[in-house]
């Protein structure tokens, strides 16, 4: 991996027990997994010519062209080929999209902001302004916080759990694309029926921008460019899913995903690491302008979305109280119960981060020993704060030290609950599209071929 030829910031390297993507694509030369779309960027994989000159006349193959859609349909590796991720979704695509669109919007995750803040020694306020200034100088109209989209997800998760029969539990979070790919390709029949149907914040943000904002501004979705800055390379893969295209079109709701490290490299390259003067946009709505003013929204429950904590909160509110107890099983596993005064367990949720812990969970589920109601799952040890696209450091000690700082910065983010703005957008969206709620959910399906035999643990 270290000799891949890619910039150091775009490698998924040495993230503890995280399973890195396979560099050797196994899609056969003769077959196509997914029909290619003309507009998709492509990566050429050339094959060596046979030694036998005579046979080469009949056996020589054309270049194989692999897209992210191919990766999603193939079970050759857990996530995807790094080459494809980098070549298809890069800053070149961002510049092109901004130039060719009538409206450009960038969604930025608070995890990315805190990672950059730790790296350059600035506050999250300052970093938010730097990022907004950088993109607006490129021609982006709106730079928004993904926390606004996460609010839609939070409003739905307890309702989803409440309607999930106890026999179908645990309900598994779906915000981590690495885990979703693992579930689809390795344990489809067991895990897919239990995965939450609620979209991730990135996917919801794409729906808001292409499904709501575009309509409100009188634009076609194809005239709007939406990029996202995320802590995870697999978010690039998520954006390429067929489910996350504007209904009835080939237009992606999120056109391009850039990792935290890729963004910082580009900001430094353009010598734009200071917050510049951004024109006064006080007339803009709060959710469209807050990030540009340095406002970043955090959440109770840590940097991985706070889904488990939100369920506990809503359960306690609905049931008039309860005794909440949290146990740390290891540094990447947490269990929380809500008990009655008599000691009866009324609700049990868990946080499970890192593939080793995920595998232990799967083993328990196979033997029906897992009694948890809801599990917040992240593929990376440490969760989203330690995503594969975050700023990486040379030694493991330095990585752990910086991760603690990133988590602390996230914990210190204000819990601004702009309920009024959120309700206003939701109501306005419903007026434009009475079926808007459908855009907050998705479906997953197993990938038929099993890859257990090719995994190297």
Curated annotation (Swiss-Prot):
Keyword Ligase belongs to the record: no
Binding sites annotated in the UniProt record for [4Fe-4S] cluster 2: 176, 232, 380, 384
Location of the region described as Disordered in the Swiss-Prot/TrEMBL record: 38-59
Region forming the signal peptide: none
One term under GO cellular component: cytosolic [4Fe-4S] assembly targeting complex
Keywords annotated in UniProt: 4Fe-4S, Iron, Iron-sulfur, Metal-binding
One record GO biological process: iron-sulfur cluster assembly
Residues reported in the UniProt entry to bind [4Fe-4S] cluster 1: 25, 71, 74, 77
Domain of life: Eukaryota
Deletion phenotype: Arrest at the L2-L3 stage in 90% oxygen.
Keyword Iron-sulfur: yes
InterPro entries in UniProt: Cytosolic_Fe-S_CAF, Fe_hydrogenase, Fe_hydrogenase_lsu_C
GO terms for MF: 4 iron, 4 sulfur cluster binding; metal ion binding
Family note: Belongs to the NARF family.
Functional note: Component of the cytosolic iron-sulfur (Fe/S) protein assembly machinery. Required for maturation of extramitochondrial Fe/S proteins.
Record's protein name: Probable cytosolic Fe-S cluster assembly factor oxy-4
Protein source organism: Caenorhabditis elegans
């Amino acid at each position: 991996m270290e000799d891949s030829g890619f910039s150091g910031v775009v490698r998924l390297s040495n993230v503890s027990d995280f399973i890195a993507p396979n560099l050797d694509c196994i899609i056969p030369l003769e077959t196509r997994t997914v029909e290619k779309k003309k507009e998709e960027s492509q990566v050429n994989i050339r094959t060596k010519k046979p030694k036998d000159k005579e046979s080469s006349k009949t056996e020589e193959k054309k270049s194989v062209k692999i897209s992210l859609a191919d990766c999603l349909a193939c079970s050759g590796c857990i996530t995807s080929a790094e080459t494809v991720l980098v070549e298809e979704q890069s800053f070149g695509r961002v510049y092109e999209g901004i130039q060719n669109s009538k409206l450009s919007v960038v969604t930025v995750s608070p995890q990315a902001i805190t990672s950059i803040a730790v790296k350059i020694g600035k506050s999250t306020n300052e970093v938010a302004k730097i990022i907004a200034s950088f993109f607006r100088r490129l021609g982006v109209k709106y730079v928004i916080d993904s926390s606004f989209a996460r609010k839609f997800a939070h409003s739905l998760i307890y309702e989803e759990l409440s309607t999930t029969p106890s026999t179908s539990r645990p309900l598994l979070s779906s915000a981590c694309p690495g885990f979703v790919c693992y579930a689809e390709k390795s344990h489809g029949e067991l895990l897919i029926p239990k995965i939450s149907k609620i979209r991730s914040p990135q996917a919801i943000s794409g729906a808001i921008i292409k499904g709501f904002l575009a309509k409100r501004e009188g634009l076609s979705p194809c005239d709007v460019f939406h990029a996202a800055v995320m802590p995870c390379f697999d978010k690039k893969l998520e954006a390429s899913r067929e489910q996350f295209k504007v209904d009835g079109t080939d237009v992606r709701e999120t056109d391009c995903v850039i990792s935290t490290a890729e963004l910082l490299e580009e900001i430094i390259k353009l010598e734009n690491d200071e917050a510049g003067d951004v024109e006064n946009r006080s007339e803009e709505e709060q959710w469209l302008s807050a990030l540009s003013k340095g406002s970043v929204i955090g959440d109770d429950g840590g940097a991985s979305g706070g889904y488990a904590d939100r369920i506990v909160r809503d359960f306690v509110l609905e049931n008039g109280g309860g005794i909440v107890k949290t146990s740390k099983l290891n540094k990447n596993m947490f269990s929380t119960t809500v008990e009655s005064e008599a000691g009866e367990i009324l609700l049990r949720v868990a946080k499970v981060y890192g593939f080793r812990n995920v595998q232990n969970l799967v083993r328990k589920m196979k033997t029906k020993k897992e009694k948890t109601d809801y599990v917040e799952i992240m593929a990376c040890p440490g969760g989203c704060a330690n995503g594969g696209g975050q700023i990486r450091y040379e030694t493991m000690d330095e990585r752990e030290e910086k991760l603690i700082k990133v988590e602390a910065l996230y914990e210190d983010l204000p819990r601004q609950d702009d309920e009024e703005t959120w309700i206003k957008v939701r109501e306005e969206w419903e007026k434009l599209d009475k079926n808007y709620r459908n855009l907050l959910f998705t479906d997953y399906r197993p990938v038929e071929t099993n890859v257990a035999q090719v995994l190297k643990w």
